[in-house]
Amino acid sequence: MNILIFEAYSDANIGACALVENAIALLRRRYPAAAIRVMAREPGVFRNLYGVDAVPDVFEYPFLQPRWRQVIWLVRALLWMASCWIAAGLHDRDRLRTTRVPFRSKIEDFLWADLAVSVGAERINDKFFKNIVFSLYTYALLRRIGARCVIFPATIGPFLFGWSRRLARRVLSGVDLIYTRDEASLEITRGLLGPGTGTVHGTSDIALMQEQIGRDEALTIIGAAGEESIVGISAMRWSYFRNRIETPYSNFEAYVREMALLADTLIDEYGVRIVMYPTNYPVHGCREDDLGVSLEIRSRMSRGKDVTVIEELPTPARLKGMLACSQINVTTRMHACILSTGAGAPTISVNYLFKVREHMRSLGLEEFSIDIEEFNSQWALETFRRMWPERERWRAHLERAVEEKQRGILDAMKYLDGVAR
C-alpha cells in the first residue's frame, strides 16, 4: 500500500513537524509494509529528518510575495486546478496514469497514493480563509481520481461565512474518514454531515504522542542549571480577525505589552528564569515568525537581560523536552500548549482559537485558560499564583490525563482499517 501524507507544510512550524513525525510513526506501526511519502513545502527537510520519500507541495503558495506575483500564481493555479479536475472526470485512475493530460505532473503523487492522509490540522476554518478553498479542492480531487482520503485529527470550524460552510459540507461528505481533535470540532462536523455519519470520529491531536529528549540534554540546550526554576512562554503574532469580543486587549500591541509585564513580574516576585519558546521560525518556507515576537517581548521588558530566547529551530522532541523542564508554561500556540501539557508541565493557555480552549478543557485545565482577546497580565498573574503552589499536583494530573488520551489515539487508529483495505 502507498500512503501519501500531505499538507505537511514545514518543519519550521514545529507543530506541523510534530504532526508529520507522529503520523509517520502511527502509520508505520499499523501498516509496517506500506510505502510512505510526505508532501511538504520543504520536502528535503522531512526526507533528512525521518528517512522518508518526500515531494514538494502541490500548492507552492506565494506567501510574502508582491501582489502581482500572487495574482500570476493564482491564475496559473486556477488553470491547472480546472484542467486536472476535468481530466479526472474524463478518465479513470488507471487511464490517468498512462494518458498524457495537461498538468498531470501536479497529480502524479495523488495517482501514486492508495491512501492520502492530511495532517493540515487547522485548514478547514474561516480564520485561515486563504487556505480553505485549496484544501477542500485537494480533498475533492483525491476522491475524484479514486484515492482514499483521510483527515488526521483536525480542528474543523469555525465557519464565519455561508459559502464556506456549504462548500465544506459538500466536500467533507466525500472524505472517507475524518478525525477531529476536540469536542467542538466533532459537533460542528456532525452538524455539517449529519449526526449519524460513521466517517467522523473524535480523538486527540496526535502531537500528544510526541517523544521527547531527556532533561539533561534539554537543560544544556536552554543553558540552564538543574536547580533553576524555569517558566516558559510561547508567544505568537495573531491577526485579531473577526474578534469574538472587542476589549482594550484585543490587539497585538496590547498582547506584547501584557506579556512583557507578566514576564517582568514573574522574575521580580518568584525569581524564575524566563525562557521564550518560539514554535514558528522564519526559515524553510515558514511564513510565521514567533522568534521575532519573542525578541520584541523581551525588548519591551525591564528585566529582558534575564530572559532566554531559543533562537535556533529545535525538533519537536527537543522542544517538548525543554518545555518539560519548566515549573509552569504560558502558551499561546496550539502545539506549544499540546507539547507542554504532553510533557506533564502545568500550563496556562492564551487561546487564539477555540481549539486551544477545547484542549485545555479536555485536560481539566479550563480555569487556567483565557481567550486572546481578553488576555491581560493581571489575569495571568492571578492564575499563575493559583497554580504555583499546586504545580506538582497538576503535573501528576496531566501525566494521567495524557496517558489516557494517548491510549485513545491508538484505539482510534482502528477506524483506518476500514479505509486502508
Task: State each model region's role.
Residues 1-421:
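Active-site anion-handling motifs in enzyme catalytic cores
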